[in-house]
Structure formats: structure tokens, C-alpha cells
Design a protein with these regions (language model features):
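Phosphate- and other anionic-substrate recognition elements at nucleic-acid/protein interfaces
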Residues: 1-176
């Protein structure tokens, strides 16, 4: 089985695929509550608990873990250097937890490489997260999204979609 993770400090998307590439689990783990998760370490502890549930309770025999590679370059108008550093730090903590839980180091896939492996093309000026979500809604009957009263995807929808694409790209690389 394959685990794909979209790691961020607010919501972590997680998707588990069978060896045939079928989705058996696709969730978003919400870490935004500052009372429950005041530091990166409480957030990491929650992710660890969820990974242990996949491993010990759901009994998914995860043999490969793929994690979306964190951004490595500062670009004006996007995330600040501090935000990128925090994300990279959290990504490292989660990577270590995955290695300890599944006894194998995770593999990293960039978002653009994952989209390309899944046949998703993002036109200039379009938001990649929206393109990915719409691609899945149009092409996979098993993927669904709940919407807010204003018609926007509920929090976690984009994270689930991204983890799905990371898992599928990992599956594709293993089967090519």
C-alpha cells in the first residue's frame, strides 16, 4: 500500500492507495485549533497519532510513503521566508515520524512533478489547487467534496486532493 501526504502546519492531507492504485482512505487532518495545537510539536504529535491509527487500527500495510516536497525558494508576493522555514521544519518532523512508524524513509515528490505524472496541466494564471480539485471531481467518481454555504470547498478539500495526487504520482513511479 502507498501513503501520500500533503503536509502543512494547518491541515495535513492523507491518502492511502492499494497496490492496484485504488483509494481506500482519503482524509484531511485539521491542525488549525491553536488551543489544541499551540506549537509544531503538538501538531506533529497529532499527525503521529493519525499515522499510528492507519498502521495499527486500520491495519494498512503501508510499504511506501510519498510526501509533497516543501517549497525551497522564496518568491516575493508569496510565503515569507519565515513561513517557508516553518513548513520545512514541520515537513522534516513528519518525515521522521513516518520513517519511525513505517520503518522506511519517505520519498519526496514536488507538486509540479506529481501533477504532471497524473496528467494535470495548470495553465498560466490558474490556481494549481483549484485545477487539481476540479480534475479529481471531473475524473474520479470516488472523490467528493463538501461545500460551504457560499459554494466554496470546505477546508481540507484541497489538502485531500493534493495528497491524492501525491499518492497517485508515487504509485505511477513505482509501476512504470
Amino acid at each position: 500500500m502507498i501513503l501520500g501526504l500533503d503536509v502543512s502546519t494547518s491541515i495535513v492531507g492523507a491518502t492511502v492507495l492499494t497496490d492496484c492504485g485504488d483509494v481506500v482512505f482519503c482524509e484531511a487532518w485539521d491542525l488549525r485549533n491553536k488551543n489544541h495545537f499551540p506549537t509544531l510539536y503538538e501538531k506533529a504529535q497529532r499527525v503521529k497519532q493519525m499515522l499510528e491509527i492507519l498502521h495499527e487500527v486500520k491495519r494498512y500495510n503501508i510499504e511506501h510513503v510519498f510526501i509533497e516536497q516543501s517549497l525551497q525558494a522564496f518568491r516575493p508576493g508569496f510565503s515569507s521566508a519565515k513561513t517557508l522555514l516553518t513548513l520545512a521544519k514541520f515537513n522534516g518532523i513528519i518525515s521522521y515520524i513516518c520513517q519511525k512508524c513505517y520503518l522506511k524513509p519517505p520519498e519526496f515528490i514536488s507538486a509540479s512533478t506529481a501533477r504532471k505524472a497524473c496528467g494535470i496541466k495548470v495553465e498560466r494564471g490558474k490556481k494549481a489547487k483549484e485545477v487539481v480539485l476540479n480534475f479529481l471531481l471531473d475524473n474520479d467518481d470516488t472523490f467528493s467534496v463538501e461545500y460551504t454555504k457560499h459554494g466554496n470547498p470546505k477546508p481540507g478539500s484541497y489538502d485531500r486532493a493534493d495528497s491524492y495526487i501525491i499518492a497517485k504520482a508515487g504509485w505511477t513511479s513505482l509501476n512504470s
